[in-house]
Amino acid sequence: MRVLGLNGWPRDFHDASAALLVDGRIAAFAEEERFTRKKHGYNTAPVQAAAFCLAQAGLTVDDLDAVAFGWDLPAMYRERLGGWPHSDSEALDILLPRDVFPRRTDPPLHFVQHHLAHAASAYYFSGEDRGAVLIVDGQGEEECVTLAHAEGGKITVLDTVPGAWSLGFFYEHVSEYTGLGGDNPGKLMGLAAHGTTVDETLSAFAFDSDGYRLNLIDPQARDPEDWDEYSVTERAWFAHLERIYRLPPNEFVRRYDPAKGRVVRDTRRDPYEYRDLAATAQAALERAVFGLADSVLARTGERTLFVAGGVGLNATMNGKLLTRSTVDKMFVPPVASDIGVSLGAAAAVAVELGDRIAPMGDTAAWGPEFSPDQVRAALDRTGLAYREPANLEREVAALIASGKVVGWAQGRGEVGPRALGQRSLLGSAHSPTMRDHINLRVKDREWWRPFAPSMLRSVSDQVLEVDADFPYMIMTTKVRAAYAERLPSVVHEDWSTRPQTVTEASNPRYHRMLTELGDLVGDPVCLNTSFNDRGEPIVSSPADALLTFSRLPIDALAVGPYLVTKDLRH
């Protein structure tokens, strides 16, 4: 079967994406932001991502057996907005406009319940036959948590938690309160390691063996003017935090920055002052999720756990879940957030139509790829000098070993929020100054933000305390004492790191580069962060990579088989 999964709609949506399954295998998968260059793909159908997916597979809409959408939009409109105003044909015209997707007939359109799409993205691509499912996010159609049992290709819902008790919204509201922004929960997670937990209940949570209760908000509270409870929970949490926390909300202001020569958006206080609140919020989140996980594992009798939903991107929480005594195996897809519901919806419909889903494997590289001719044409348009080294991997390794920052744009682009050796900025993991250099000079961001390492899987058991595959940078683990001092730029305050383990099968060129680096510096480990400027999506095309390379103090760019260098001093 050929099933195109979609996420993204013109009203109040984020993370627009498209995924194409052909006979149960991922043929293409991409985020709309990578094409539009507008981060998070807000309030748009995934037109460009869908066009890429079909082009990648050499298909048209007429070749599709089904289109799947990762929300039950008709139910949401009927419940919240007075009725669903579109026929399936009209909805398809919004999602796949005919001027871009000409067709003789419309394929069947399936609206998949949101948490089922999340569950499918984790379970069907895990390679496991059975396990317990835990979905935690901001909110689906109504629920913010789903507990389910996956077995024999079927997903059975056991329990849900209503949206007013959302852990995802709670974490976003705390992030907003600190001045980090509600759409930057990853920053709050990073800040938490610098703080001290004060009271993990926050005078609002009650934790028990089944998860949590929230004494702050009526679980049945509804927002009559919107289709989720974000505003209801925001008002309640901000009022509560102002009562119990020593600092007021960190307000955003506009001020003139002499260094940048323009008016910028900033906060009245340094968000670092809120580090104890960040640590407390992280502890509360973990306590609640651990209870939910233990509950669904006990109720299903399983020891394999599948996790998805936006909260599933919390790598610190995931790393601790992995080591709980109740968990033997755990799978969190690299697209745990709403990016992944296009893939999950496609999988749910494909299974319904009789397909078996192939495991995801150790890669997220399903985006666009560019030929050497296309890369060379982009280079020629810039007028930059470049060359084609006989051993690109060795030269890049030597640059990293000498303290340079290298842009790396190779193969098919990743999908998801993490750069995984396809569109990455690479630096020395051994340099004591590299973290500050990339944070402050290259990426123009907070000094306390951590960086993650890529390392060969063959040495990860020596570097990390947990011997496991970490292909997606979606779990943290502790670094062994001997390596914590050797790899200062990729080890966080609490001696944790969010590793990517690399095998030859998963990424041959990146594996060769890390091998060469190991020969030069002793450890096949490098700092790996996303290749993007502040506030922008990860680069996709050679033109994106070259533009970002020209704007940022990056020393070299390896794009396809070519190497571009410039003389920038740290």
Curated annotation (Swiss-Prot):
**Which residues does the Swiss-Prot or TrEMBL record annotate as the active site?**
14
**InterPro entries from the UniProt entry:** ATPase_NBD, Carbam_trans_C, Carbam_trans_C_sf, Carbtransf_dom, NodU/CmcH_Carbamoyltrnsfr
State the organism of origin.
Streptoalloteichus tenebrarius (strain ATCC 17920 / DSM 40477 / JCM 4838 / CBS 697.72 / NBRC 16177 / NCIMB 11028 / NRRL B-12390 / A12253. 1 / ISP 5477) (Streptomyces tenebrarius)
Map out region (Kae1-like) in residue numbers.
1-354
Entry keyword set: Antibiotic biosynthesis, ATP-binding, Hydrolase, Iron, Ligase, Metal-binding, Nucleotide-binding
Q: Pathway it belongs to?
A: Antibiotic biosynthesis; kanamycin biosynthesis; Antibiotic biosynthesis; tobramycin biosynthesis
The encoding gene: tobZ
What name does the UniProt record give this protein? nebramycin 5' synthase
List, separated by semicolons, the cofactors it needs. Fe(2+)
